[in-house]
């Protein structure tokens, strides 16, 4: 570890690899609400966050665990669950009176066709206004889980996807 008067210690969250302060500053200066998408190995979490001088305020949120309420029994960490979580989040957010946001993926790698962009597609399909480029979205076959049904015997993920999507649409229609 370097020492001396010229050595500057980075912020703790930067050292831990948890916050990109340059990106955060750009997002905060836009003064728009952020659609924050975070993924773990088992779940997807999406929040609408408003900047505030006293700290960010969460306005609306959805997590993939909530899909069980709509009859989804598959893995909550896959592309299908990410899309359905985004769709659920979008409808919940619109019902609460919010109409737009800017995507915030944090320090996650931006990879076309990833779960992050599957969640964004769900948010956009619900009607929430989020600036995006549709070329980064995964294909509809991957979102429905048809690639899983091909190699996994007894998998009915596309049918479950359609049923859960209909239940979400029915609740918010």
Swiss-Prot record:
NCBIfam families the record matches: PRK08569.1
Family statement drawn from the similarity comment of this UniProt entry: Belongs to the universal ribosomal protein uL18 family.
Organism: Methanococcoides burtonii (strain DSM 6242 / NBRC 107633 / OCM 468 / ACE-M)
UniProt KW Methyltransferase keyword: no
Protein name, as recorded: Large ribosomal subunit protein uL18
Function: This is one of the proteins that bind and probably mediate the attachment of the 5S RNA into the large ribosomal subunit, where it forms part of the central protuberance.
Cited HAMAP family: Ribosomal_uL18_A (MF_01337_A)
Subunit architecture: Part of the 50S ribosomal subunit. Contacts the 5S and 23S rRNAs.
Domain of life of the organism encoding this protein: Archaea
GO biological process: ribosomal large subunit assembly; translation
Keywords for this protein: Ribonucleoprotein, Ribosomal protein, RNA-binding, rRNA-binding
MF term (GO), any: 5S rRNA binding
Cellular component GO terms, alphabetical: cytosolic large ribosomal subunit
């Amino acid at each position: 570890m370097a020492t001396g008067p010229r050595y500057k210690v980075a912020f703790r969250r930067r050292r831990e690899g948890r916050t990109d302060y340059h990106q955060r500053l750009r997002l905060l200066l836009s003064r728009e609400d952020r659609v924050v998408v975070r993924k773990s190995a088992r779940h997807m979490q999406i929040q609408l966050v408003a900047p505030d001088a006293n700290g960010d305020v969460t306005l609306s949120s959805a997590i993939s665990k909530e899909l069980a309420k709509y009859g989804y029994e598959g893995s909550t960490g896959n592309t299908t669950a990410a899309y359905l979580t985004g769709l659920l989040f979008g409808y919940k957010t619109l019902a609460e009176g919010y109409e737009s946001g800017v995507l915030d993926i944090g320090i996650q790698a931006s990879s076309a066709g990833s779960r992050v962009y599957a969640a964004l597609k769900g948010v956009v399909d619900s009607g929430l206004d989020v600036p995006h480029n549709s070329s980064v979205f995964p294909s509809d076959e991957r979102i429905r889980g048809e690639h899983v049904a091909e190699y996994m015997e007894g998998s009915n993920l596309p049918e479950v996807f359609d049923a859960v999507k209909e239940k979400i649409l029915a609740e918010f229609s």
